[in-house]
Amino acid sequence: MVTAFILINVERPRLKTIADDLLAIDGVAEVYSVAGPFDMIAVVRVKEHEQLSDLVTERIGALEGINDTETLIAFRSFSKKDLGMLWDIGVD
C-alpha cells in the first residue's frame, strides 16, 4: 500500500468544486482545506507507485482550477492507533 499526501494550490473560488472532484477519484481517501503555502491536501492510498503516478499526473493534474501540486510519499506510519487495518479494508 502506498500512502501519499498531495499538496495542492487551486483557484480559490473553485475550492469546493475541486474538493468534490478529488473525492470522486479512486484512491483519494480524504481532502482537507488548509492554511499555509498550499490550499488543499489530498490523502491518497493506492496499491502501487504506478497507480500514484497515473493518479497525480493524469487525474489530479487534469482537473480544471488546479494550479500546482507537490507530492509527498509516506515511508512509514507512526500512530497511537492501528491505522493500517482501517486503511486496508476494502482496498484490493
Specify the residue positions occupied by each region the protein language model found.
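A compositional/biophysical signature of low hydrophobicity enriched in polar/charged and small residues
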Residues: 1-92
